[in-house]
Amino acid sequence: MADPRFFRRAGPFSLAQLASLSGAEIAPGADPALLLHDVAPLESAGPEQLSFLDNRKYADAFARTGAGACIVHPDLAGRAPAGTALLLSRKPYRAYALCAQAFYPAPAAEGGVSPGAHLHPTARVGEGTEVAPGAVIEAGAEIGNGCRIGPNAVIGRNVRIGDGTTVGACASLSHCEIGSRVVIYPGVRIGQDGFGFAMDVAGHVRVPQLGRVLVEDDVEIGANVTIDRGAGPDTVIGRGCMIDNLVQIGHNVHLGPGCVVVAQAGISGSTKLDHHVILAAQAGITGHLKIGAGARIAAQSGVMRDVAPGEQVGGSPAVPMRQWLRQVAVLGRLVRGRGDEDNGRNG
């Protein structure tokens, strides 16, 4: 159960309501009027709680669950225990996410500028926007309606922020335009200089970074992410991208819609990711590359060439996934063989 000190719960919701908002179907025999009061894991859910099964690995836990209702793929519905109502979905995790959002909606902005905030006379703050103590809103900045600006956040000169966007504590935004319903977590840095220098033994000369960062609607940017502004072209984060904590995005990078970038990954300057690319944790992409739509980059990979649409790569330097797995297997056999030889000599 979520700690009520931190999470405010809505509801209850009927099975019919949850089916409607999640796109799931009520299984035959289930009562559409059944009221659910909360969500919970399979192992701990009770008769007034909703759970879900997405991974077949947990089918045994599903068979033993005490949940009042469960979201499940139709193929696994036969494993359900007696007394558990079912919502059938071919995407159970997505359906669960929509239901969980209903039970635990994001808190709305309370509205109002704290007396402890610093708001420039030429800055504009929309209706219902909350500006916390210590926040700094610089000259010419425009913040939309229903936004939340956290403590000690800095919104730089002429920055624009769309409606319903949240900027976390101690984040700093400059040289950027932020869309609507964007979530920016604490410590994020957007719009600082890109890493651009004319290298020379006589001394490195900084190249002025004259672009911006454009963040489109419905993006999430995790804690302590850094996104450099463009050198001339803009750095662009496409609609619906999800960026995990501690990610570095270099100048002129372009992320297409729906990309997912996982923690500690890095993307060097001028690289372009098409839509719905997945970049796993600690992977790195060198500059000036093109990563095709739907490509998947394995964790800790080092990408040094273009990646075709839909291709899966891994390793450093990154190669097609099957080739990488063969390399790992061969290396393992070589190491084990060498170990056997060493043991023979020592014996």
From Swiss-Prot:
Homotrimer. This is UDP-3-O-acylglucosamine N-acyltransferase. The lineage of its organism: Bacteria, Pseudomonadati, Pseudomonadota, Alphaproteobacteria, Rhodospirillales. Keywords: Acyltransferase, Lipid A biosynthesis, Lipid biosynthesis, Lipid metabolism, Repeat, Transferase. It comes from Rhodospirillum centenum (strain ATCC 51521 / SW). One of its GO terms (biological process) is lipid A biosynthetic process. InterPro entries: Hexapep, Hexapep_transf_CS, LpxD, Trimer_LpxA-like_sf, UDP_GlcNAc_AcTrfase_non-rep. It is an enzyme of class 2 (transferase). NCBIfam families: lipid_A_lpxD, PRK00892.1. It holds the Pfam family Hexapep. Its EC number is 2.3.1.191. Pathway: Bacterial outer membrane biogenesis; LPS lipid A biosynthesis.
